[in-house]
From Swiss-Prot:
Disruption phenotype: Reduced plant height, reduced panicle length and reduced seed set. It is an enzyme of class 2 (transferase). The lineage of its organism: Eukaryota, Viridiplantae, Streptophyta, Embryophyta, Tracheophyta. Residues 653-934 form the Protein kinase domain. This is LRR receptor-like serine/threonine-protein kinase ER2. Residues 22-581 are extracellular. The keyword Nucleotide-binding applies. Glycans are attached at N64, N73, N220, N233, N269, N304, N328, N373, N391, N408, N456, N509, N527, N542. It is found in: Cell membrane.
Length: 986
């Protein structure tokens, strides 16, 4: 009887659960109503909500017995709208994952009614408001992940009432107030992530009550006070990150009792000495004490840290010599001692650090020669000894550093000649020997450094000529040879350097004219003042950018820029011949005499020390020397990688992994441990003006997710090179497909081109209209439109653009962009707004329509199309691949119209990108989705992953498809701007 009763009760419970589950289908449909952008991602969420149906809907996992919703995973679908309060009706759901969408509004209080919930992940959205107190009702909750939103208010102290909470990640929000002390009494909490908020108050002595906590991160807040003396009791900590707060006092002695792998205290106001006991923390892999006010010597006992890979002590007030014992740190990869007050010699023992990637000794008071032993650091990528008192010569043995990309020995007292062996350092992208006493000629072999981006030999005693071999520096962006004794002409070969942005030759003895530079279209900074140049200063091409100050001190130069006429009457010419001849003979004799005297005195005056301090810039103006080389992961598909992993996988960014070059970066391909490929962009700029602002911008960009934008997965900033990690897209750039050689060039039919145009427009429209703050791309071009395996367009390189200010326009100090795509209004005024991007996009449309480059053999595609439009012959320019595959050439004509509208000369006459999307959307007619083969969002499993696997597997994704617009709005757009296909739109 008892067994029968029990069975009946069990069956009754199951029937009740099944009956309750019948409501889950209707609940899901109610949740869908609050979402936007659902048409192409939740297309199967339809019908009457019967159990057997909704359990097969995308992202829905049901219990095998009751058919109740057990898990809901809609991550990475770019869903907009809000979270419906109806979500509280999912009584049996154990996991809700809505991360990496565009959800806004507040977290509904009804979330507290999901009483079975174990994992709640709403990260990487735009959710605002307070964290609801109702979450404290979720007694089974193990993982609460709300990072990267816009949440405000205080952290609810009621979160301490969650007895099973193991992961609490509230990073990258706008939370304020203090960290609730009651949280520290949660016995099972293992992960506490609070970085990048506005938290105040002090570190509680009770923080070590968390006996299971291994990850404690409060980086980038406004915490004050001292590190509590009880810190030594936090024996379970593996990662302790207190960086970028306002903490003061000395580093407590008992911090040495910790067995952490990462100890990061940088960017605070700690003072006093470095505790010697830190040398006993054998588990340390990363020790970062940089950018504080620490004083005294570097403890020699730090040499005992044989497992430490990164040692950052820069930006303090450390004195004394560099301990030779640091050479015993056998696994060290990064040694940053710059911006201190260190004295003495560079220890030869540092040569034992054969695994070292980065050695930064800049801005100290080090003396003596550079030891030859440094060349034993075979894996060294960056060596910076700028701003010391080093003497002797540049070691010839440095050429053994085959992996080095960055060499800066500037602002010292180095003498002798430039070793020709430096030309063997084939991976160099930066070579800076400026502000020394280096003498003799420039070795012509330097011209063989094909990856060189920046060359600075200024403020030395160099003689001879500028080598014509510099014309082989195809990647070079900056050349500074100013303040030397160079003579001869500016080589014609230098005028062929298409990537050259800066050329400084002032204060030399250079002769001839400047006409050879007229074809350096990218040249933005030119200074040839105080030489012996003569002739006419051009006024066209790039020379329109330069002020008269660029040409001062050259009496023989003339022209419009200098306010002096290059032509005089024949009478004046004849009357001055005799006087000129006499004067010329006298001057020539004097010059010959001076040359003889100079040759006799050369060995003596070549060694006269210069005042190095005159060319030593303010260290605060060069934050790059203060950049700790850290790897920051923004999305978890790269989680638990370290910088060394990436260096190892790419063999220290070997050239064999290069897949492309850009105006601002070299691009490498790296296959991660999980076999997922990523693209690594190594930026040419080493010195962001504001490191913290730059990092904040990168983190913001990393949170931007859209189907048609290339996602920033992470970044690393260091003097060795700033690296950005992006999604890798299989089919390269649109430029490759349209213009590359036979190996990459593909035939694109009309439908594919339309979809590429629409995808790029959707990505750009999202930046202009849906980001907060809005973003101007600044360099829209076919090389920045990448194509995935299905040839869907993804807009790249939007990440480094400055966010729009609250004003309507943004004034840039220099013209950005690529020749052929630059808005003429922007080029003339440097005033930048969204319409500058619209112009560039219009040029991309012309590329798609014609298959031709924007500029080719001095032929400008835009001008050519305008002339054809004026003659009503524009259709002659259509790419043959379009003519063969397009069923309605009227569509082609409409896109020509749109391209010319986008590239109108007056910005106010151009459409917005939202309007462009509407027009293209009406031309693209995708088949209605029937039953596309889409993978389920969650594995069909009856169990929910453990909290560790759940958190490790966090990853971004996006599959947004924009809403369609009515044809009426498209017709209104064409009516608004008028027919332009037969008009000259200039």
């Amino acid at each position: 009887m008892t067994t029968t009763t029990t069975t009946r009760l069990l069956l009754a419970a199951i029937l009740l659960a099944v009956a309750a589950a019948d409501d889950d289908g209707q609940t899901l449909l109610e949740i869908k109503k609050s979402f936007r952008n659902v048409d192409n991602v939740l297309y199967d969420w339809a019908g009457d909500g019967a159990p057997r149906r909704y359990c097969s809907w995308r992202g829905v996992l049901c219990d095998n017995v009751t058919f109740a919703v057990a898990a809901l995973n809609l991550s990475g679908l770019n869903l907009g709208g809000e979270i419906s309060p109806a979500i509280g009706n999912l009584k049996s759901v154990e996991s809700i994952d809505l991360k990496s969408n565009e959800l806004s509004g507040q977290i509904p209080d009804e979330i507290g009614d999901c009483t079975s919930l174990k994992t709640l992940d709403l990260s990487s959205n735009n959710l605002g408001g307070d964290i609801p107190f109702s979450i404290s009702k979720l007694k089974h909750l193990e993982n609460l992940i709300l990072k990267n939103n816009q949440l405000v208010g205080m952290i609810p102290s009621t979160l301490s009432q969650l007895p099973n909470l193991k992961i609490l990640d509230l990073a990258q929000n706008k939370l304020n107030g203090e960290i609730p002390r009651l949280i520290y009494w949660n016995e099972v909490l293992q992960y506490l992530g609070l970085r990048s908020n506005n938290l105040e108050g002090s570190l509680s002595p009770e923080m070590c009550q968390l006996t299971g906590l291994w990850y404690f991160d409060v980086k980038n807040n406004s915490l004050t006070g001292i590190i509590p003396d009880t810190i030594g009791n936090c024996t379970s900590f593996q990662v302790l990150d207190l960086s970028y707060n306002r903490l003061t006092g000395e580093i407590p002695f008992n911090i040495g009792f910790l067995q952490v792998a990462t100890l990061s205290l940088q960017g605070n106001n700690f003072s006093g000495p470095i505790p010697s006991v830190i040398g006993l923390m054998q588990a340390l892999a990363v020790l970062d004490l940089s950018f504080n006010q620490l004083s005294g010597p570097i403890p020699s006992i730090l040499g005992n840290l044989t497992y430490t890979e990164k040692l950052y002590l820069q930006g303090n007030r450390l004195t004394g010599s560099i301990p030779p014992e640091l050479g015993n740190m056998s696994t060290l990869h990064y040694l940053e001692l710059n911006d201190n007050q260190l004295t003495g010699f560079i220890p030869p023992e540092l040569g034992k650090l054969t695994g070292l990637f980065d050695l930064n000794l800049a801005n100290n008071n080090l003396e003596g020669p550079i030891p030859d032993n440094i060349s034993s650091c075979m894996n060294l990528i960056s060596f910076n000894a700028y701003g010391n008192k080093l003497n002797g010569t540049v070691p010839r043995s440095l050429h053994k550093l085959e992996s080095i990309t960055y060499l800066n020995l500037s602002s010292n007292y180095l003498s002798g000649a430039i070793p020709i062996e430096l030309a063997k350092m084939k991976n160099l992208d930066t070579l800076d020997l400026s502000c020394n006493m280096v003498a003799g000629p420039i070795p012509s072999a330097i011209g063989s450094l094909e990856h060189l981006l920046r060359l600075n030999f200024s403020n030395n005693n160099l003689v001879g000529y500028i080598p014509a071999e510099f014309g082989n520096l195809r990647s070079i962006m900056e050349i500074d040879l100013s303040s030397n004794h160079l003579g001869g002409l500016i080589p014609q070969e230098v005028g062929m350097l298409q990537n050259l942005i800066l050329l400084k030759l002032e204060s030399n003895n250079i002769t001839g004219d400047v006409s050879s530079l007229i074809n350096c279209f990218s040249l933005n900074v030119l200074n040839v003042s105080y030489n012996n140049l003569a002739g006419i200063v051009p006024t066209d091409n790039n020379f329109s950018r330069f002020s008269p100050d660029s040409f001062l001190g050259n009496p023989g130069l003339c022209g419009y820029w200098l306010g002096s006429s290059c032509y005089s009457t024949s009478h004046v010419q004849r009357s001055s011949v005799s006087r000129s001849a006499i004067l010329g003979i006298a001057v020539a004799g004097l010059v010959i005499l001076l040359m003889i005297l100079a040759a006799a005195c050369w060995p003596h005056w070549a060694q006269v020390p210069k005042d190095v301090s005159l060319c030593k810039p303010d260290i605060h103006a060069l934050p790059s020397s203060n950049v700790p080389p850290k790897l920051v992961i923004l999305h978890m598909n790269m989680a638990f990688l370290v910088y060394e992993d990436i260096m190892r996988m790419t063999e220290n960014l070997s050239e064999k992994y290069i897949i492309g070059y850009g105006a601002s970066s070299t691009v490498y391909k790296c296959v991660l441990k999980n076999c997922k490929p990523v693209a690594i962009k190594k930026l040419y700029a080493h010195y962001p003006q504001s490191l913290k602002e730059f990092e904040t911008e990168l983190e913001t960009v990393g949170s931007i997710k859209h189907r048609n934008l290339v996602s920033l997965q992470g970044y690393s900033l260091s003097p060795a090179g700033n690296l950005l990690f992006y999604d890798y897209l299989e089919n390269g750039s649109l430029w490759d497909v349209l213009h590359a050689g036979s190996s990459k060039k593909q035939k694109l039919d009309w439908e594919a081109r339309l979809r590429i145009a629409l995808g790029a427009a959707q990505g750009l429209a999202y930046l202009h209209h849906d980001c907060n703050p809005r973003i101007i791309h600044r360099d829209v071009k076919s090389k920045n439109i990448l194509l995935d395996k299905d040839y869907e367009a993804h807009l790249a390189d939007f990440g480094i653009a400055k966010s729009l200010c609250t004003s309507k326009t943004h004034t840039s100090t220099y013209v950005m962009g690529t020749i052929g795509y630059i808005d003429p209004e922007y080029a003339c005024t440097s005033r930048l707004n969204e319409k500058s991007d619209v112009y560039s996009y219009g040029i991309v449309l012309l590329e798609l329509l014609t298959g031709k480059k924007p500029v080719d053999n001095e032929c400008n595609l835009h001008h050519l199309i305008l002339s054809k439009a004026a003659d009503n012959t524009v259709m002659e320019m259509v790419d043959p691949d379009i003519a063969d595959t397009c069923k309605d050439l009227g569509e082609v004509k409409k896109v020509f119209q749109l391209a010319l509208l986008c590239s109108k000369r007056q910005p106010s006459d151009r459409p917005t990108m939202h309007e462009v999307v509407r027009v293209l959307d009406c031309l693209v007619y995708p088949d209605p989705p029937s039953k596309p083969a889409l993978p389920p969002a969650l594995p069909q499993s009856s169990t929910v992953p453990s909290y560790v696997n759940e958190y490790v597997s966090l990853r971004g994704g996006s599959t947004l498809s924009c809403e369609n617009s009515s044809s009426a709005s498209d017709a209104e757009l064409f009516l608004k701007f008028g027919e332009v296909i037969s008009q000259n739109t200039e």
